[in-house]
């Protein structure tokens, strides 16, 4: 049979226990001893491994408990979503603050058609590209500006173009400027101030914005601007 306790001690000293102890105890058909070894310890890697093993055997409650001990909140939320416990998944994300768990929940909520909630959790996970995509597709224009201001420049420009098409020129100008596309911001500002060919739809207030922008640029502006 061999000295199991001694072998475990040596594996731990060598730092190979996460792989070797499960292998040894499985080979010796001592699964209960393996469960005791893992669950009485606090090794995150082993707890995750045991959780996956429990999940593969359909013992989802045990899997959930050990995923929680390992602070693998993504897996806890995944199990909750699989079982249809969406509200439980929401509570887990709220309590843990886990961004990966929030992203998984957002994808699940989107699949369920719960768009507003999906957008909120995409935002919580800092996946602003998905939040912006859904907000555009579902007419959530009032929230777009906030998402864009927290995102990278390419997304700011994308939202600015969307808002420009919707006639939200002031917001478009602000986003173009923040994204570093000053030339485009000036162009939109000027066109909005002048209106169409007949001068209709003019927004004289945009001249003030235009002046402020050109003053900020000063004499060091690129000739292209």
What name fits each language-model region?
Residues 1-225:
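Extended alpha-helical assembly domains of large eukaryotic scaffold proteins
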């Amino acid at each position: 049979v061999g000295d199991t306790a001694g072998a475990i001690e040596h594996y731990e000293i060598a730092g190979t226990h996460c792989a070797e102890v499960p292998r040894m105890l499985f080979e010796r058909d001592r699964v209960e001893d393996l469960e005791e070894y893992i669950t009485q310890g606090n090794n995150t890697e082993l707890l995750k491994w045991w959780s996956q093993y429990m999940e593969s055997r359909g013992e989802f409650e045990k899997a959930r408990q050990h995923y929680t001990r390992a602070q693998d909140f993504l897996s806890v939320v995944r199990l909750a979503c699989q079982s249809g416990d969406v509200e439980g998944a929401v509570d887990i994300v709220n309590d843990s603050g886990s961004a990966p768990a929030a992203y998984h929940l957002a994808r699940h909520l989107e699949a369920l058609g719960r768009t507003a909630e999906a957008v909120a959790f995409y935002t919580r996970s800092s996946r602003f590209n998905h939040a912006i995509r859904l907000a555009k597709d579902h007419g959530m224009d009032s929230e777009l500006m906030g998402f864009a201001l927290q995102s990278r420049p390419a997304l700011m420009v994308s939202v600015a173009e969307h808002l420009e098409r919707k006639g939200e020129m002031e917001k478009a100008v602000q986003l173009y400027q923040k994204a570093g596309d000053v030339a485009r911001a000036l162009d939109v500002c000027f066109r909005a101030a002048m209106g169409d060919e007949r001068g209709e739809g003019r927004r004289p207030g945009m001249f003030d914005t235009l002046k402020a922008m050109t003053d900020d640029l000063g004499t060091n502006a690129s000739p292209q601007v």
